[in-house]
């Protein structure tokens, strides 16, 4: 991966209009006056889209194996997108462990679910590191990377915020990022945003519903 330019270590406010609002609301668990016009709960336990639309493509992103991420190839499956990074000390490992438990609750149906863990830290998260990291959680969790620009574009399409902090004296830097999960159904439509602390049983139920 090419090294990020200095300005790329500054603040990145990337918004996807309603998606950004959904992620914030899901993460905070709050209600907004007039929200029923935008959202619907239906049978899902996260914050659902009332009029599902095709999920934005993840152009330029590849799996840790180097294969392009093609959401069209995942039709018939529930797809979860989670943006994070392997050096994350708390939210990412906790969230991936929760996703893994929800997947395991599906039994034989676990093959109908794929989680894309999209790194927002491509300089440190090499494909090899991503593959090792995700393998600790589940074989249904796939590490995804790409150029800094491709990742920023994907984040913008899904309303994901992230910010790379300045490195400390030892070269370490933290990354702030949206901690919610985005759910795509078996028809390739955006359906729901879950907070990272969603109940594992509720998440498993939703994954069955989305296939």
Predicted regions and their residues:
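Hydrophobic beta-strand anchors of alpha/beta hydrolase catalytic cores
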Residues: 80-81, 115, 181
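Short, hydrophobic alpha-helical segments
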Residues: 207-211
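Short, small/polar residue-rich loop motifs at catalytic or cofactor-binding pockets
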Residues: 54-56, 78, 176-178
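A short beta-strand-turn-helix
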Residues: 59-79, 103-106
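N-terminal targeting signals for export/organelle localization
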Residues: 1-56
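Structural microenvironment flanking redox-active thiols in thiol-disulfide oxidoreductases
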Residues: 94-154
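Short active-site neighborhood of thiol/selenol oxidoreductases, capturing the structured segment around
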Residues: 72-99
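Thiol/disulfide oxidoreductase modules built on the thioredoxin-like
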Residues: 150-206
């Amino acid at each position: 991966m090419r090294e990020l330019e200095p300005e790329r270590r500054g603040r990145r406010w990337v918004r996807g209009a309603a998606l950004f609002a959904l992620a914030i609301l899901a993460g905070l668990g709050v209600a907004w006056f007039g929200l029923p016009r935008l959202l619907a709960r239906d049978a899902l336990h996260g914050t659902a889209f009332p009029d599902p639309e095709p999920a934005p493509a993840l152009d330029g992103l590849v799996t840790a194996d180097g294969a392009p991420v093609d959401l069209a190839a995942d039709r018939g499956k529930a797809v979860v997108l989670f943006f994070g990074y392997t050096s994350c000390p708390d939210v990412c490992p906790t969230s991936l462990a929760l996703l893994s438990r929800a997947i395991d609750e599906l039994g034989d149906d676990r093959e109908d679910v794929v989680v894309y863990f999209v790194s927002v830290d491509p300089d440190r998260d090499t494909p090899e590191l991503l593959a090792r990291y995700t393998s600790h959680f589940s074989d249904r969790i796939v590490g995804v990377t790409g150029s800094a620009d491709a990742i920023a574009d994907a984040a913008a399409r899904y309303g994901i915020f992230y910010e790379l902090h300045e490195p400390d004296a030892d070269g370490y830097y933290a990354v702030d990022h949206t901690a919610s999960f985005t759910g795509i159904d078996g028809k390739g439509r955006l359906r729901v945003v879950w907070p990272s602390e969603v109940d594992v049983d509720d998440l498993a139920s939703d994954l069955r519903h989305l296939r």
